[in-house]
Structure formats: structure tokens, C-alpha cells
């Protein structure tokens, strides 16, 4: 049995969409480019196929197929473009979430983003609005991007909490800022490491339910840094027995995700 899901990555060209996809997945899934001609009019897709490791030996095998869609630069979109692209995505398989990227100082039209967010929320698609390349502009530009995100999302849901540099709007949306790869400016002697990726992944985990939650976990299954760094938070969130997990890891190796995701499934479908 194959369960199919889609993730849409949206935003203007050259804001770090592909870099973010690779950082989330923990490996190179999407091709990156520094070219000024990196915009494209066609959607690209990257398919991740995962086999479900059931905690119940007798259970039938389940495959999860997750397609990550890298959409064309949104700056040229009209409302018809939004509807066309998302109709295509929704007809392909179950939409999991939409991740919108904007970097400090990048071109953004809030009316287009509003169409996008409204389309997703009406279709029960979780929205993550992300300020990418957070150090590529000044603090003022970064703050402006995040303020625009917050202002837009409060039209659809009040902010329910603010944790680990992430603002949550119920189980409808979140917004945050990240640095997907090391940022370095030799001229002024600034070097910033990767920031916010683990927190973003965990934030989406806390916001999704049932099969969408499981599909997201399989999307980031190979991100070993996330699973090793955030294991305790995941175990606490789903009230997973630590002794059981430790026993599995000692017996079968240190691939945390392989044994933790089935335990997450068991806890998620029990709720």
C-alpha cells in the first residue's frame, strides 16, 4: 500500500528554496544554483520514497511517497497561477504543507502571498512562512519580513505561542527565520552557522497529525543531525518510552529515525 503526499516550496527566485529543501532533508535532494538566471517557469519535483518500519511485525507494509514541488518564482504569479499550480499539486496526491521562502530584502508582493496562504488554509494545507538566508540582509530587513508574515497570518488565526524563534498560529501556520547554510562575509569578518532548521522541522512535527505527521517524519528521516539533536524533545512530545527506544538502538544500531518513527506512528494514531 502506497500513501502519497506533496510538499510545496514557494517563493521568489534566488531566496534559497533548494538550499532549504536540502537542509530539511539532511542531504542533497534539490539542485542549487547561484546564477542570476535561476528563475524557471516550470515546477520541479523531487520524489522521496520511504518504506514504513512497523512496530507490529504482522502489520501490512506501507510505503510513503513524498513529492517535494519547487514552484516557479512567485513574483510573476497571478491568482490564476496560484490556483493552477495548487490544483495540479492537490490532484497529484494529498497536500502535506506549503513552505514559503523570502530572504531579507528579496522581492515580495504581499497580495500574492495572501492568495497563496488563503488557498492553502481553505484547502487544509499547513503553511510555514520562512525568512531564509536570515543574515544576508540587515536586522531591519529581516524584522520587516517576519513582521509581514505575522501581520498576514493574524488575518486567519491569532498567534497561539512563540517558542524557539517560531511563532505559531494554531495548527494552521507558523513563521520563523533560518540560516540553511553557513553565511560568511570576509570583508566585515562575519561568520554565522546553520540556524533554525531543527526548530523548524520540530515546529512542523508539532503542528501536523496522523498520516501527514508520519509523512513529514519520513521526509526528514535521513536528517541524522535533527534526530540526534532533537530526539529527547520528540520522545517527550509523543510520550515515547525511553527504555524501549534505547533497547531498539542498542540491538539494531544508531539509525534513530528508523526506530523512532514507528513509535511516533503508534503514539500519533493512538491520540
Regions found by a protein language model. Give the residues of each.
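Flexible beta-alpha connector loops of hexameric P-loop NTPases
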Residues: 72-80
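Canonical P-loop GTPase G-domain recognition
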Residues: 135-212
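Conserved G1/Walker A P-loop phosphate-binding module
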Residues: 1-72
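Conserved C-terminal guanine-recognition region of P-loop GTPase G domains, centered on the G4
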Residues: 59-63, 84-170
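C-terminal accessory extensions appended to soluble enzyme cores
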Residues: 196, 201-239, 260
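Residue-level signature of catalytic and energy-coupling elements of molecular machines
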Residues: 20, 99, 200
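Membrane-inserting effector segments that mediate pore formation, membrane fusion
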Residues: 231-271
Amino acid at each position: 500500500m502506497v500513501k502519497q503526499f506533496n510538499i510545496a516550496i514557494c517563493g521568489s527566485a534566488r531566496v534559497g528554496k533548494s538550499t532549504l529543501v536540502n537542509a530539511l532533508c539532511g542531504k542533497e535532494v534539490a539542485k542549487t544554483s547561484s546564477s542570476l538566471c535561476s528563475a524557471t517557469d516550470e515546477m520541479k519535483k523531487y520524489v522521496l520514497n520511504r518504506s514504513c518500519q512497523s512496530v507490529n511485525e504482522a502489520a501490512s507494509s506501507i510505503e510513503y511517497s513524498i513529492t517535494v514541488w519547487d514552484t516557479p518564482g512567485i513574483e510573476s504569479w497571478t491568482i490564476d497561477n496560484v490556483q493552477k499550480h495548487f490544483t495540479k499539486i492537490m490532484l497529484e496526491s494529498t497536500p502535506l504543507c506549503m513552505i514559503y521562502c523570502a530572504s531579507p530584502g528579496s522581492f515580495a508582493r504581499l497580495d500574492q502571498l495572501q492568495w497563496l496562504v488563503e488557498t492553502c488554509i481553505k484547502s487544509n494545507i499547513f503553511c510555514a512562512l520562512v525568512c531564509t538566508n536570515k543574515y544576508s540582509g540587515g536586522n531591519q530587513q529581516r524584522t520587516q519580513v517576519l513582521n509581514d508574515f505575522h501581520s498576514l497570518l493574524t488575518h486567519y488565526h491569532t498567534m497561539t505561542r512563540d517558542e524557539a524563534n517560531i511563532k505559531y498560529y494554531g495548527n494552521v501556520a507558523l513563521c520563523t527565520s533560518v540560516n540553511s547554510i553557513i553565511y560568511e562575509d570576509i570583508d566585515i569578518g562575519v561568520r554565522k552557522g546553520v540556524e533554525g532548521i531543527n526548530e523548524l522541522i520540530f515546529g512542523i512535527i508539532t503542528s501536523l497529525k496522523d498520516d501527514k505527521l508520519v509523512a513529514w517524519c519520513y521526509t526528514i528521516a535521513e536528517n541524522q543531525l535533527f534526530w540526534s539533536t532533537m530526539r529527547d524533545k520528540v520522545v517527550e512530545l509523543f510520550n515515547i518510552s525511553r527504555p524501549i527506544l534505547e533497547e531498539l538502538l542498542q540491538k539494531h544500531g544508531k539509525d534513530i529515525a528508523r526506530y523512532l518513527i514507528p513509535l511516533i506512528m503508534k503514539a500519533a494514531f493512538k491520540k
